[in-house]
């Protein structure tokens, strides 16, 4: 099958520097809506991916995201939200970005060209066939991600990918692929825009639904949320009051008993 980089295609919007701010805002918003439409088309693929991640998580496996640039940062962002939101240990959902931590703050473009580095990074986390790895790359060609996913398949580790081009090299090494075709970017080739938006929406679904299936949500409440600041402490108190029908004093007492998170007070007995 042929491979064509839609993500590098010429923008549908011309002479941007000659447009008014209002025109630019409306044009970008129109393209953002196209990202939503693209995600809508791949919901069955997202469903299939999550249905295959969930058993791994439930059996004690881990979820890894690997990516470079914006794609890698989005994976790290999604992973970093799991401990405070769902009470998971930091090693349960892990985001790896080409170039490591410095790449979160500044662009280290050369780091993405190493085919073997992602596997080294995964090996540092003692990756096993009980884990699941998702490669994130708008183009689907990033060597860091392609090499990492290929090595995972070679070692019988389940894989998925989130890409914005069809029939990409990365898709070849994904057991479960999500090809979310957002079309040309507003700014030609700037995949941090629509592609990044679509990737973030899909990552939201992957982590949130996986955690729901793993028992970290009751009703629509985050029952394993970490009470790490005043805002979250108030939220925890409100959840306990609503779920158990107790007053604020009793909720505070239960919070003190639970010490760390709110799952025990809110679980049915």
Segments (PLM) and residue ranges:
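Cofactor-/ligand-binding subdomain signature composed of acidic, glycine-rich
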Residues: 1-38
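Single conserved hydrophobic/aromatic residue that forms the stacking wall/gate
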Residues: 260-269
